[in-house]
Curated annotation (Swiss-Prot):
Gene from which the chain derives: TET3
GO biological process: auxin-activated signaling pathway
Pfam families: Tetraspanin
PANTHER family: TETRASPANIN-8-RELATED
Residue positions the entry lists as glycosylated: N34, N187
Signal peptide (residue range): none
Species name: Arabidopsis thaliana (Mouse-ear cress)
Name of the molecule in the record: Tetraspanin-3
Length: 285
């Protein structure tokens, strides 16, 4: 029994350590929500899951140390629910960020972003005028476009140098007009609109050289936010999938050790056949 308790304690300690990357991923997304992506709701489920794993693993660790079978049982039940929630969350994150990506542009190092390339619930949420008002205000306050400017020994960046840059989705979608507008480059956030092509892209009419406006109300800016969010979530999802696989392995080990503790407490010999007519087998915690 002591060996099984030690094993359960070790598994719970390792599970506690596994909660750190999940919680760290949620905190990282939260920091980006305040400065880059400006979407402040998707990170909270991840933070809650990370904290829950921490608390439950500590309860299981205490149960193993003090041989409290109730705490061990509670760990197994709640951890099973957490694993199910993490699976659902990973599926949801992939589903809402599945479609959409930037379009390559001839002779440009950056991509252009178009809202029609995205679809689903997340696009509808970002497209909502009242919600977008909060996001665009966050983008302005974060100075996303102020950081785009560059100079070399006091010399401003030339058009050719700018065109070869790899801009982030937010910088490309919110800080410059779409390439198909045909505006002439003046500086990173200033463009000569004379002689441009006002075609079917409505963002060409929305663009403003006013530094407080730029393309914050453009559909391309909304698409850029979605593109940035997709990149962030895909990075975090890879970590979550790895953690999920390890969690499942640890859970199976903890369950086997818990069953062994119960078997010893009930004075059942190892390898006892439980499939008999008088003693049918029951699968229970």
């Amino acid at each position: 029994m002591r060996t099984s308790n030690h094993l359960i304690g070790l598994v719970n300690f390792l599970t506690f350590l596994l909660s750190i990357p999940i919680l760290g991923g949620g905190i990282w997304l939260s920091s980006r929500a305040n400065s880059t992506d400006c979407l402040r709701f998707l990170q909270w489920p991840l933070i809650v899951i990370g904290i829950s794993i921490m608390v439950v693993s500590l309860a299981g660790f205490a149960g193993a140390c003090y041989r409290n079978k109730f705490l061990m049982w509670l760990y197994l039940v709640v951890m099973l629910l957490i694993i199910a929630a993490l699976i659902g969350f990973i599926i949801f994150a992939y589903a809402v960020t599945d479609k959409g990506s930037g379009r390559t542009v001839l002779n440009r190092g950056y991509l252009d972003y178009y809202l029609e390339d995205y679809s689903g619930w997340l696009k509808d949420r970002v497209s909502d005028d009242s919600y977008w008002g909060k996001i665009s205000s966050c983008l302005r306050d974060s100075g996303a476009c102020r950081k785009i400017g560059r100079n070399f020994n006091g010399v401003p960046e030339t058009a050719d140098m700018f065109f070869l840059r790899r801009l982030s989705p937010v910088e490309s979608g919110c800080c410059k007009p779409p390439t198909d507008c045909g505006f002439s480059y003046v500086n990173e956030t200033g463009w000569d609109t004379r002689g441009g092509m006002i075609g079917p892209n409505q963002d060409c009419m929305v663009w403003s050289n006013d530094q407080s406006m730029l393309c914050y109300q453009c559909s391309s800016c909304k698409a850029g936010v979605l593109g940035s969010l997709k990149k962030s979530w895909r990075k975090v999802s890879v970590i979550n999938i790895v953690v999920l696989i390890i969690l499942v392995i640890f859970y199976v080990i903890a369950y086997a050790a818990y069953r062994n503790v119960k078997r010893i407490d009930n004075d059942e010999p190892a390898g006892e056949a439980r499939m008999t007519k008088s003693h049918p087998s029951h699968f229970h915690l």
